[in-house]
Amino acid sequence: MGNLFVKKPQITEVDRAILSLKTQRRKLGQYQQKLEKVIEAEKQAARDLIREKRKDRALLALRKKRTQEELLKQVDQWVINVEQQLTDIELTSKQKAVFESLKQGNSAIKAIQSELDLDDVQKLMDDTADAKAYQDELNAILGEKLSAEDEEDILAEFDNLESQLIVDEMPEVPTKESEESEKLDLPDVPTKTPVASNAEITPAESATKTKVLEEPLPA
């Protein structure tokens, strides 16, 4: 149902001219084919007449052939002219389309520019410049460049801190005192024969010991 209300494209004078030229080109092409057939036929007739020793008729056929060839050349030129005309129309149509596009683009630019207030644009540019100047000044205060001497001191301090960290992370070297403290806490080696306690002496050992003590020493 929707197709019933579609508006047909309007045929312009350019469309009619293009259609006419294409029709003429098609007719000229058909005429070329006809002339080529006539030329070939006259050529074949001349061969046959020469074979029959009919020189006059053979020459007449060749004259007709030449006439048709000249006409074919003229038709070829007409076809070239038609093709050139079609090319010019197509090029001109494209140029017109480009011109219309440029015209619409120019109108769009003017419409956008009409919505821009020059005072607002100038104010925006001034605000942007002020903000940039403030930021540059702030960066200059917070990030002043250091002198060469300051840079050398910073590098030296960095090397010092790095060396300290390396030393701190290394395991400690044991000293003599720490080695002695780490020795096992063993008892001293006895220098005298250990004497057993009375509780550990048996009755037999006690009697023997008493007897020995009671015996007189030899004179």
Curated annotation (Swiss-Prot):
Superkingdom of source: Eukaryota
Cellular compartments per GO CC: endosome
Membrane spanning stretches: none
GO BP: any one term: protein transport
Family under the similarity heading: Belongs to the SNF7 family.
Residue ranges of the region described as Disordered: 171-219
Role, per record: Component of the ESCRT-III complex, which is required for multivesicular bodies (MVBs) formation and sorting of endosomal cargo proteins into MVBs. The ESCRT-III complex is probably involved in the concentration of MVB cargo.
Keywords: Coiled coil, Endosome, Protein transport, Transport
Biased composition (Polar residues): 194-209
UniProt name for this protein: Vacuolar protein sorting-associated protein 20 homolog 1
